[in-house]
Amino acid sequence: MTTPASEATPVRRSHPTRWAALVVGVVAIFLLVLLFTARTGERRTGTTLVGKAAPGVEGKVLRGDAFDLGNADRWVVVNFFATWCTPCIAEHPELRAFAEEHAKTGDARVISVVYDDQATAVQRFFDQRGGDWTVFDSDEGRTALDWGVAKIPESYLVSPNGTVVAKFISGVTQAQLDAVIASYDDEAGS
């Protein structure tokens, strides 16, 4: 016995609009998750170095005086950058303001490590944008590897006792650096 065609269960066909809506929904959820988990430039991030002794900084000095991080006895911002990096260019005035302010008291300084860039481009960058601090050549990336640099700009704040206390990704501001220093100074004063 067969069922008449009018009583047969209709075959469901997928509609392209349903698939498109599903794909758009999945992509929207993915982008929202990405947005909320990758807030760059506005926060400190964890790293395996935070709480540990800072690695050395080596390489040819391109600008400024030779500097030994192990004998700093003050706060040091170690900044990894390149002249072709847009966020690096954007953060440079903040680093310059921090360096100038703390040069007055001598309690902190900035050093930069070039990441995949040319010495002539770095010289031109500092000549045009200012900044009077020590700049190390990249030493073929060994220093960046020692510090665990994944992308630039990355900055590390090292305490006067040589411990890495914070890591900043995708740019840092003078206010962020000063806030971390103040929080440690407050703890020391308590």
Language-model features: locations:
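N-terminal targeting signals for export/organelle localization
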Residues: 1-56, 190
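A short beta-strand-turn-helix
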Residues: 56-76
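Short acidic-hydrophobic, aromatic-tinged amphipathic segments that line or gate anion-handling sites
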Residues: 59-60, 134-138
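Short pre-active-site segment immediately N-terminal to redox-active cysteine/selenocysteine motifs
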Residues: 74-76, 81-84, 151
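C-type cytochrome heme c attachment motif
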Residues: 83-90, 154
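Structural microenvironment flanking redox-active thiols in thiol-disulfide oxidoreductases
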Residues: 89-129, 139-145
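Thiol/disulfide oxidoreductase modules built on the thioredoxin-like
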Residues: 124-131, 138-190
